[in-house]
Swiss-Prot record:
InterPro entries: Actin, Actin/actin-like_CS, Actin_CS, ATPase_NBD. Keywords: ATP-binding, Cytoplasm, Cytoskeleton, Nucleotide-binding. Polymerization of globular actin (G-actin) leads to a structural filament (F-actin) in the form of a two-stranded helix. The binding of profilin to monomeric G-actin cause the sequestration of actin into profilactin complexes, and prevents the polymerization. This is Putative actin-9. It comes from the Eukaryota. It comes from Arabidopsis thaliana. Belongs to the actin family. Disulfide bonds: none annotated. There are 8 actin genes in A.thaliana. PROSITE patterns: ACTINS_2, ACTINS_ACT_LIKE.
Length: 366
């Protein structure tokens, strides 16, 4: 039977069958319960929960990619198999994805639930960054994943993540939105409600760009260069955005402007590569893949390339790639991996689980 590939990222669950070009189902990763609290056992999963959000409290059982509510996570997997894919998990191997720094106890719990609650014949857990690399046709490189709240650099060599080289940055798209709100507030605009926050996020995505040279860009504006853009608010009012367009994304390269002591994304990538074996570094510098919504900012690839070239030996060729953003990239990588003829040797089988217990996941899913 075809393996099932199930990915959870950016608040959505994507599931389908190995070998397919796209997931069969995509739905919100939420469990909703009535706000009145009269029946705490009543719950609505996925689209059902989303459709009734006016009367429900919606919760995602994961935070920063890490499960923190296993009962709800099990409900979501049950809903995925039986309601969305309409299959019996006892008949399909299952490939699940995980974020970097997924705690050991969580990996074991995922394994235990798959075998004990769903009675799957085999399962595997793969890091999302590795699968993202697969989807771009590579098995070696560094994945810089710019998330909403946190970002990660994950070096991968010949299809395996190098754990000692993984770095976490407490820097993400949300910081850029917050900084833009701060700058716009200084100019006399106010953004306090969640609807207003959404407007600022939209301004960021549509009008902001990364300066190739920040100081030079600043100088241009003081010398009368016009980089103004107009944004039409939902009520028809117009606001003009000027130097904020490039000041906002500068946070990625100079987190100190918002008071963060974190490294810039270019330094984190370099530091991540320096933690890898010397003989792998040339391949790493030549395959730097950026992913996440923030990578859509115009100019980010060129600036990243420039900053890295200034940090690394001139003998190293730096190549930064920003593949066309596909919400399904990780899932597609999983579909490719689970359909490889050699992959059947990698699955954790039911027999292995029964013999070694859930800790087998650390040995087989590295």
């Amino acid at each position: 039977m075809k393996p099932i590939v199930c990915d959870k990222g950016h608040g959505m669950v994507q599931a389908g069958f190995a070998g397919d070009e796209a997931p069969k189902v995509v739905f919100p990763c939420v469990v909703g319960r009535p706000r009145d609290g009269l029946n705490p056992n009543e719950s609505y999963v996925g689209e059902e929960g989303h459709a009734n959000r006016d009367i429900l409290t919606l919760k995602d059982p994961m935070e920063h990619g890490i499960v923190n509510n296993w009962d709800d996570m099990e409900k979501i997997w049950h809903y995925t198999f039986y309601n969305e894919l309409r299959v019996d998990p006892e008949e399909h191997p299952v490939l699940l994805t995980e974020a970097p720094y997924n705690p050991k106890a969580n990996r074991e719990k995922m394994t235990q639930i798959m075998f004990e609650s769903f009675d799957v014949p085999a399962m595997y857990v793969s890091m999302q960054s590795v699968l993202y690399l697969y989807s771009s046709g590579r098995t070696t490189g560094v994945v810089l994943d710019l998330g909403e709240r946190v970002s990660h650099t994950v070096p991968v060599y010949e299809g395996y993540a190098l754990p000692h080289g993984i770095l976490r940055l407490d820097l993400g798209g949300r910081d850029l939105t917050d900084y833009l709100i701060e700058i716009m507030t200084e100019r006399g605009y106010t953004y306090t409600t969640s609807a207003e926050r959404e407007i600022v996020r939209d301004i960021k995505e549509k009008l902001c760009y990364v300066a190739l040279d920040y100081e030079q860009e600043m100088e241009k504006t003081t010398k009368g260069w016009t980089i103004d853009k107009t944004y039409v608010l939902p009520d028809g009012q117009e606001i003009t955005i000027e130097a904020e367009r490039f000041m906002c994304p500068e946070v990625l390269f100079q987190p100190s402007v918002i008071g963060k002591e974190s490294s810039g994304i270019h330094e984190a990538t370099r530091n991540s590569i320096l933690k890898c074996p010397v003989d792998t570094r040339r391949d790493m510098y030549g395959n730097i893949l950026m992913t996440g919504g923030t990578t859509m900012l115009h100019g980010i690839k060129e600036r990243m390339t420039k900053e890295l070239n200034a940090l690394v030996p001139s003998s190293m060729k730096v190549k930064v790639v920003v593949p066309p953003e596909s919400e399904c990239s990780v899932w597609i990588g999983g579909s490719i991996l689970a359909s490889l003829s050699t992959f059947h040797q990698m699955w954790i089988t039911k027999d292995e689980y029964e013999e070694h217990g859930a800790a087998i996941v650390h040995r087989k899913c590295v």
